[in-house]
Amino acid sequence: LKCFQHGKVVTCHRDMKFCYHNTGMPFRNLKLILQGCSSSCSETENNKCCSTDRCNK
């Protein structure tokens, strides 16, 4: 799962996660657009939470 950073680099606080929104199609190249930082990021089919801005958990 690859993440493509949009815009400038964003940093989050230690207790927060980078929240991405999945704009890709299933079983194809997924593009995750950075939505912002959140302390309560819930992962769903269309959302992904990462501990870094590059989605490297």
From Swiss-Prot:
**Where in the cell is the protein located?**
Secreted
Against SUPFAM superfamilies, the record matches this protein to: Snake toxin-like
Instruction: Work out whether the entry's keyword set contains Secreted.
Output: yes
GO molecular function (one):
ion channel regulator activity
Keyword annotations for this protein? Disulfide bond, Ion channel impairing toxin, Pharmaceutical, Proton-gated sodium channel impairing toxin, Secreted, Toxin
A single GO CC term for this protein reads: extracellular region
Q: In which tissues is it expressed?
A: Expressed by the venom gland.
Please report the name of this protein according to its UniProt entry. Mambalgin-2
Source organism of the structure: Dendroaspis polylepis polylepis
